[in-house]
Amino acid sequence: ETILDIIFRGDQPSAAVPGGSVFNGIVSLGRMGINVGFISETGNDRVGNIILQFMRENHIPTDHVNVFPDGKSPVSLAFLNEQSDAEYIFYKDYPKQRLDVLFPKLEEDDIVMVGSYYALNPVLREKILELLDQAREKKAIIYYDPNFRSSHKNEAMKLAPTIIENLEYADIVRGSLEDFLYMYNMQDIDKIYKDKIKFYCPRFICTAGAEKVALRTNLV
């Protein structure tokens, strides 16, 4: 998913940029000249046009972005603290018909990145599973980033079976300590890996803001 982030420092808006966990990763790869594709949706409106233009400027094809005629493109307000950590408020008005788009052709060792609530949303689950099944069939590498926000922490138990299913599909799981605080109320990296990740996926990358990145595998 991509969304237009309106960034606030203090109480004043300072910028408006397309964002999203998976989207930000794709943007970085596109800027490096790596061949990428992005599956998403946006509205036929000014916000949607900003997102599509940003993609083109960063060498990301828009072939697999569904532009829906009804509803509105999603927007978030991101309030940054002194450490530049963001607290989000989301505004979304999607149509009933979702993600009506053809998936790109996958090949062995392609990397498929999925994440955020987009990969958990019951409305989109059938399409997400279709993509994950194609990736598994073609022997692509599945990279899962939960990017679990505080706005969904009260749904964590209800979403747990879907999270587990995503972990089972994943070849690599990358999450932040903040994600696992909201998902499991856990902050110990070793305990998160041993109790929540390892059984489903042996490869785990955990970030902690400005602190060191941690790697856990069945060999490390």
Kindly label every feature range from the protein language model.
Residues 1-10:
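Positively charged, low-complexity intrinsically disordered leader regions
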Residues 6, 35-116:
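Conserved N-terminal subdomain of the carbohydrate kinase-like
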Residues 10-19, 220:
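Short pre-catalytic strand/loop immediately N-terminal to key active-site residues, enriched for Gly-Thr
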Residues 24-35, 80:
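Alpha-helix C-terminal capping segments
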Residues 93, 117, 147-151, 178, ...:
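Active-site beta-loop-alpha junctions enriched in small/polar residues
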Residues 138, 152-220:
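Conserved phosphate/ATP/ADP-binding segment of small-molecule kinases
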Residues 139-146:
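Short beta-strand/loop segments at the ligand-binding rim of alpha/beta enzyme cores
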